Amino acid sequence: MSQLGSRGRLWLQSPTGGPPPIFLPSDGQALVLGRGPLTQVTDRKCSRNQVELIADPESRTVAVKQLGVNPSTVGVHELKPGLSGSLSLGDVLYLVNGLYPLTLRWEELSTSGSQPDAPPDTPGDPEEGEDTEPQKKRVRKSSLGWESLKKLLVFTASGVKPQGKVAAFDLDGTLITTRSGKVFPTSPSDWRILYPEIPKKLQELAAEGYKLVIFTNQMGIGRGKLPAEVFKGKVEAVLEKLGVPFQVLVATHAGLNRKPVSGMWDHLQEQANEGIPISVEDSVFVGDAAGRLANWAPGRKKKDFSCADRLFALNVGLPFATPEEFFLKWPAARFELPAFDPRTISSAGPLYLPESSSLLSPNPEVVVAVGFPGAGKSTFIQEHLVSAGYVHVNRDTLGSWQRCVSSCQAALRQGKRVVIDNTNPDVPSRARYIQCAKDAGVPCRCFNFCATIEQARHNNRFREMTDPSHAPVSDMVMFSYRKQFEPPTLAEGFLEILEIPFRLQEHLDPALQRLYRQFSEG
């Protein structure tokens, strides 16, 4: 067994459902990883000796040297045979061709100094103790006052108790509004209780055994526009005015915690209710971002600015009401959900259309991909074409369309099949590759990825939440593509056009599938 460092050891973490942790030698010995049982990688593009790793526990870094032919990636840097890179804690090593991620982690020694704590999802040795019964999940007691967690603030007032049912509320526009009458508060004290009926209703809920919770998005804190301490003071003043104990969860950044994504609810259920299960059916969420249409009630001419609160309730499965419906007993107003519903997406359905065509050609050809950033092009191409021997040409990797053309021409001269993995929105961007095919005397086909802009934006948000190494794609880029887009036609010179519907990957981890099917933008 390798000697442990003075404080712990470095290890590599696979995605959920992947192989077990890979511990790195702490004595300077090299560890070679590649295709094999340790990584559970069977892709023949990955060499059995793909990378050499040398861990340095003192600096908590790992030197990575590529041994295999196909590229490994360290963080955002793609390696070549014989070249090296360095991993720091939290960095991701992609074993080959941007696939099979392994994240560098550090494991502290236990306080006893005899055995380090097991990493997440790693079972302990049953022989280490006499009692081999499964250990009970640790119950975390809620701390009174404020806690600053990663991209999340949590406040627990005195008197808050764990309960099996929750009455949860948005803050601005639901429990309070501006005293000035303006849309946004002009100062920390520019607020008042939205309706006089609210305090009494909250007292009734508390008496009925509900835990009272506030879920609020406050992106201004993460952007540095709203000082956290100022907002904390405002929350405490509001709670004092309401007169009942609340637990408050504040999302300060985009991502998993920001409504409508369910991260704040997940934290409440898993970390902030002292192990008491919460009945979703017996709970409720109240919010004003409900997707209501213009003129949704007499005197209410403006449509809702967002649907995030209603979508948050949908994601969690909570009964939902607006403040007017809940506190004033107004009838339900008409509303509209987003055009794209991620709950409808699955791994079923045709891989491509028409199904009578062949996805792959046995002979040299050029395949030109067309589709929004986030339409699923690269994943599909890597999984189905590159794995079958097609040469992958990508502008993000090569840097310019001129280099893409040169790479395409070089591959065709070698009798290779080529796939152009760019967005290619218009006729001129596609024509250069059609010309490459004509010059080489080979056919050119188009793979048109059918994801709409709404779905592509959803896909990009999903990638940002699940892959820290993925560069965000701005809305400006997305709308620019939509403006440039010209549907591909056979008249351009394509032999065939295949339509590629977006499908979830069949091997996607169930937890990631659940996350993908959540609404992620209001």
From Swiss-Prot:
Record PTM N-acetylmethionine, positions in chain: M1
Location of region: Phosphatase: 145-336
Cell compartments where the protein resides: Nucleus
Sites where the protein binds ATP: G371, F372, P373, G374, A375, G376, K377, S378
Listed Pfam families: AAA_33, FHA_2, PNK3P
Known catalytic reactions: a 3'end (2'-deoxyribonucleotide 3'-phosphate)-DNA + H2O = a 3'-end 2'-deoxyribonucleotide-DNA + phosphate; a 5'-end dephospho-2'-deoxyribonucleoside-DNA + ATP = a 5'-end 5'-phospho-2'-deoxyribonucleoside-DNA + ADP + H(+)
Principal location class: nucleus
Documented EC number(s): 3.1.3.32, 2.7.1.78
An individual GO BP term: protein K63-linked ubiquitination
GO cellular component terms attached to this protein's record: nucleus; SCF ubiquitin ligase complex; site of double-strand break
Signal peptide: none
Region (Disordered): 110-142
UniProt entry keywords in alphabetical sequence: Acetylation, ATP-binding, DNA damage, DNA repair, Hydrolase, Kinase, Multifunctional enzyme, Nucleotide-binding, Nucleus, Phosphoprotein, Transferase
FHA domain boundaries: 6-110
Record text about domains: The FHA domain binds threonine-phosphorylated peptides from XRCC1/4, and is responsible for the recruitment of PNKP to the sites of DNA repair. The affinity is ten times greater if peptides are also phosphorylated on the serine preceeding the phosphothreonine.
Subunit structure: Monomer. Interacts (via FHA domain) with XRCC4; mainly interacts with XRCC4 phosphorylated by CK2 but is also able to interact at much lower level with unphosphorylated PNKP.
Family, as annotated: In the N-terminal section; belongs to the DNA 3' phosphatase family.
Protein name listed in UniProt: Bifunctional polynucleotide phosphatase/kinase
Source organism (scientific name): Mus musculus (Mouse)
Lineage of the organism: Eukaryota, Metazoa, Chordata, Craniata, Vertebrata
Protein encoded by which gene: Pnkp
